């Protein structure tokens, strides 16, 4: 079985650019969980060899934490992107429930940062390039990262794609120090 990156949407979520961007990808799978469903519904679709990206509206934080804890107990690596204010208010609960948390300055930036993060990780694991890591390497990085590996990245319409990519490439250099026992060249 090939490992995949999974995006688990909890509750209602508007139409997403993620689904459009990755609609033909064999490496990324989208899953949904309503607020009244338990994580057991997805037992046959989630494995500890995968990375699960959790996304939910701000008012569904309790369900996000519940799902995060359940997946963490199964040793499934979880990551999410939340508004910075929400992260700071719930720091301890989030650390106990989610492996890697990426705060953003504004709610509207969540989808953009998640898209860039998924593109980068998809390319690192499944793409052809300078960095050739398997999913276990990336899982180890995310498992040990806690709140924000990349720092807050404020994405708005005035920032060009080139600047965003430059920021992400710069932040890849930070990841180099998180990989224990590995040495490789980044850009």
Give the location of each predicted region.
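Tubulin/FtsZ superfamily GTPase core signature
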Residues: 1-187
């Amino acid at each position: 079985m090939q490992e995949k990156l999974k995006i688990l949407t909890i509750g209602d979520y508007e139409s997403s650019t993620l689904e459009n961007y990755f609609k033909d990808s064999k490496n990324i799978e989208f899953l949904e969980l309503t607020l009244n469903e338990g994580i057991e519904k997805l037992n046959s679709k989630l494995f500890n060899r995968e990375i699960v990206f959790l996304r939910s509206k701000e008012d569904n934080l309790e369900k996000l934490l519940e799902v995060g804890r359940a997946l963490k107990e199964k040793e499934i690596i979880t990551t999410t992107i939340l508004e910075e204010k929400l992260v700071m208010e719930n720091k301890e609960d989030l650390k106990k429930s989610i492996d890697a948390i990426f705060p953003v300055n504004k709610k509207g930036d969540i989808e953009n940062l998640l898209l860039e993060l998924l593109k980068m990780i998809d390319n690192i694991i499944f793409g052809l390039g300078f960095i050739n890591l398997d999913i276990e390497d990336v899982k180890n990085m995310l498992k040990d990262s806690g709140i924000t590996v990349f720092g807050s990245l404020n994405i708005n319409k005035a920032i060009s794609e080139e600047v965003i990519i430059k920021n992400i490439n710069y932040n890849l250099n930070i990841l180099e120090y998180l990989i224990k026992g590995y040495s490789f060249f980044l850009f």
